[in-house]
């Protein structure tokens, strides 16, 4: 083999590897978008049953085609407090089993038969068809879900084409003595493990490194004696991704990464010790035979399943070993309940955008709940003042401010990721609405301060003023609850109730102020009380305006329209029957006595 041919083979091998990795990444991204964060949600809600944890870890990894992605997610779950370390152990073991599905798919490249039906199972036969379907889905179908499915098909086709390129590039190497001698050196268990670990650590994908090994096997120059230790090393090397992810994380997250490493290290030691002892006594007939892609898949699966069966009963021991390695320190900061609440905005989840969007929704719901509670706690202080209530409102408003800051920053980072059309809509709605939630909590503080002023000055509203405020407060509670439900469910039909109700609240606010002026003329009220009443009604009116913003935002984003003022002008200047009907219902429901 001349230098020119060798150089061409190396370039083809590198090019094939590049296509292989790109295809795997494209397929993984497509699968993640199609799942819409549901797989990660399943992991998040798993029970403490270790067998169920293993099965879930295997299932999720088999679908997303990456044990590294699963373990990084697990590190993120543990770091955010969503998952306990004890739960993580089973998922990590399952992830190792789930990743073997890729090697079984890639083993199809080794099919050798003249039978037409069997030939159709060979990836080179059906990959072009998948590529054509994928292109049609992406270019000619205007549906984001179909486009994501198209990405999966094209990713798979590119992956298989890359695998075929690698196989073609290494086939001539079988005739090069130096190459075959190099592979034989990996029959030394230690060298084989190191080689497999280094290769996987560099490309950070055990599936890809196993694929490379399967491509090399097609030369017929890789004996099982070399393939077995390389596979063991590949399982160890894949731990680097979780270890890197755990840098800067909390202790338990680092322990989760340590569990992954210990599982593969201990599993490798046990498997290789038993295997080589039996081989020394019995002598496996296949040991010095040329490995095949299917043989690689079998070894990969047998190792991971066997290691899980052996070590699952000792899951607590792995957990303790990780805790002994990464010890608690006296000076370790205890995480407060509030800080734990914000851990759902885990930076590691940004690598799984669909799940990060779902976590952002959860945070936005909690933010909305806090602003809702702050508002109606503040309103209750007008009639029944308490210092405890004041403190609660201040704490809730402070938490809402923090949500706006941290969630807003998180959403901006998330907006730079590749997300589906549906998630993009959700992201836009959240970015628009968190400002309204924050302003509602600010109005809650203003109402609380008005209640404080009433209490400190020994003032009380008249019974008529109280009744007026009660009706206005009920209308505002109705619009706030409706707006928050519209935000949560993105319910376009329910959003139609908001604008008529907002108009009624404007009418009520004006009427409450007019009635106060009348009472002032009759000597039933004071100017000072009037200022406080006006402040409270104005705040409630502003709250209704923010609810209107939320309703309009949900409607506009879902219709791909972003001109809020034009939308409101059209709704109010050209109201339809639904608007009139809702308006009359609200007027009847909220009447001042």
PLM regions: where:
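Cytosolic, long alpha-helical scaffolding segments
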Residues: 83, 109, 222, 248-254, ...
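The feature identifies polytopic integral membrane transport proteins across all domains of life
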Residues: 41, 51-59, 82-92, 117-118, ...
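Conserved small/polar residues in nucleotide/adenosyl-binding loops
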Residues: 1-5
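Membrane-embedded alpha-helical segments of transport systems
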Residues: 63-70, 89-106, 123-130, 159, ...
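Membrane-embedded alpha-helical segments and adjacent helix-loop junctions characteristic
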Residues: 15-73, 114-120, 143, 147-218
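C-terminal ends of transmembrane helices
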Residues: 24-33, 74-81, 133-147, 242-248
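Membrane-interfacial helix-loop connectors
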Residues: 73-95, 103-125, 163, 200-237, ...
